[in-house]
Structures are given as C-alpha cells and as structure tokens.
Amino acid sequence: MSHTILIMAGGTGGHVFPGLAVAEYLKAAGWRIVWLGTEGGMETTLARQQGHALETIRFSGLRGKNVRTWLLLPARLLLAFWQSARVIRKVRPDVVLGMGGYPAFPGGMMASLLARPLLIHEQNSIPGLANRILSRLADRVLLGFPDAIKSEKKAVFCGNPVRDEITRLAPPAQRYAGRSGSIKLLVVGGSLGAQALNTIVPRALKRIPEGMRPQVTHQAGARHLEALKQNYSEAGVEGELVTFIDNMASRYGESDLVICRAGALTVSELAAAGVASILVPFPYAVDDHQSTNAKFLSGKGAAILLPQSQLTPEGLAELLVGMSRGQLMEMACRARELAQPDATRCVAETCMQMVAV
C-alpha cells in the first residue's frame, strides 16, 4: 500500500531544496508526494518540475511590512488556516512534514488540529518563531544543527539535506593534494547577491600583488551582474563573473576557498563538500541566526567567521594573502568531519517510521 506525505516548504531555496531532496528519497521508496506551497512561490515551479502533486495557499512573510498588513494579519491567517485544512482533508496524508517557509506554519497548525502525524525540520541553529510554536505540537522535531531545539523526547539531529552530487565529492585531502599556483576563490552571494561582498571583494583583490592574486569566480545575483562588472573594472581585477551557478558541486570541488554568507543550507553544503570558507553572516538576519550557523564551522577551525562590520578591503586582502594551502586543506578536512551526509535519509526514514507508530 502506497503512503502519502504532504511536504510544506516555500519562500527560499534554503527551505525548498532540502524538501525536494527528501521528496525524491521518499518517491524512490514508493511514496506519493504532495507539496504545499504558496501561490507564485519558487516552490511551485520546482515541485512541478520534479513531478510532484502541488497544492497552494495564499500567505506570505510579514517582517518589515506596513501597518495595514499587520492589521490584516488575523484575517490572512484565518484564510491560510482554512485553505491548509481543506488541503489536508483532500490529500489525507499519512505524514505531514514542515520544512519551513510561509506555508509551514498554517499547514503545521492544521495538521496538528486534524490529528495528522506532524514532523518539522529546523534548518537553522536558532529556530524562528513559527518552529518554536510548532515544536510544541509536532510529533518529531528534526534538526539541521545540534541543540537548535532542546527536547529529549522529540528532537532528532539529522543535519540539513543537501544535493547528492555534493556529498559524493572526493575527500578534501585528495582534492587539495598536489594543487599549486594561485588559489581558486569562489565568492557566492546567493540568488539575490550580497552587496557587501560585491563591493568589498574586488577592492580587496586590487590590494593583492597580481602574482599572488587568487583566481576568482564571483556569483553576483540575478540583478547585480552589471554593477559587479563595474566594480571589478574599476579595481582593475579580472574574474569570472556570473549571475548564477548551475553546478555548485563542481564549483565547490575545484575551489580552494569560498567567501559567502552563512545561511543554514550554505553552511551544510560547505561541510558536505569539505571546502575552506570565510563566512560573512548577513547582519540583519532574524535573531542573527547566520552568525550562530557560522560558528558551527568556525568553532571547530573549519571556517573563518568575519562579521560584516569588520569586512574591509584592507583586512580581507591581508587575510587572503596570509592563508597557506596547508591551512586551507586543514580547514576543508575539518569541515568534512562536521558533515551529515545521511541527512536526507535521516529525515525521510524518520517520516517513514511515523507510519508504523
């Protein structure tokens, strides 16, 4: 008999991509996948591309919205609750899995109310408000980082699911061995880009003598490529400048060092790949959770945590020049030791176990 899971995730890739990895694992095991997303969200396209059934609700984020939006919140929540309950009654899932994002809170609340087995996955080291509430109602709380939510009976540390091609990369000691010449630097700002990195990195590279300068690939973000090209041109520095990177596994595998933000999925990918990194947490993240994410690696000598307030061309240039290949390989090896390569299996099989309870 085939089982059905309702996966609730939306808003950003940090929620959606781990959910898709779990969906593929369960689909291969014979499960029927139904995805609960939000109208117009990136998840609607991605879920359909992978052949999953899709249901949507109308709900979105609230932080930073105007007074009118907040006044309408009760009505919007009631609508989202009603739509979520209608989907759950229609789909009749054996298990409901919340991976975060806008649909997960109303969907999780209704799953609990309708007595469906509910699991939530918290990607970050500090849980958001929605998961702090849902953790009290869920049957299992799956963690991307140890001790994010303290519950001896419910909590299961699985790690964050990442793409298989990243976990299959050769060990860093094997990849880094024998490399010579300029280090290969990968700068990743995410799909939206990171203005601080786009501005500071080319200025830092300008300060490094050309013979010592890293070979750089810089991912700008969809709307920032032209501005990034201008920044590099003004600095007199050459680099491979791109809006998006299709094959991150390959890029991680060939890079000696990555400079990036410290989102939960990014930190987990760096560990899974086994690559040295300089992490510049987004300073306006809720509860400053990116700094705590970064400390998962930096606290073990697997990365360097560089607050954005301390990110300067002079300081970054000095840091880059002072990093030896031996140090980079040691950081990469330590990162790989912190990886959770079976995170997808852990999340999926915990869902399977709920059917047998």
UniProtKB/Swiss-Prot annotation:
GO terms for biological process: carbohydrate metabolic process; cell division; cell wall organization; lipid glycosylation; peptidoglycan biosynthetic process; regulation of cell shape. It is found in: Cell inner membrane. The keyword Repressor does not apply. GO terms for molecular function: UDP-N-acetyl-D-glucosamine:N-acetylmuramoyl-L-alanyl-D-glutamyl-meso-2,6-diaminopimelyl-D-alanyl-D-alanine-diphosphoundecaprenol 4-beta-N-acetylglucosaminlytransferase activity; undecaprenyldiphospho-muramoylpentapeptide beta-N-acetylglucosaminyltransferase activity. CDD domains: GT28_MurG (cd03785). Its EC number is 2.4.1.227. Cell wall formation. Catalyzes the transfer of a GlcNAc subunit on undecaprenyl-pyrophosphoryl-MurNAc-pentapeptide (lipid intermediate I) to form undecaprenyl-pyrophosphoryl-MurNAc-(pentapeptide)GlcNAc (lipid intermediate II). This is UDP-N-acetylglucosamine--N-acetylmuramyl-(pentapeptide) pyrophosphoryl-undecaprenol N-acetylglucosamine transferase.
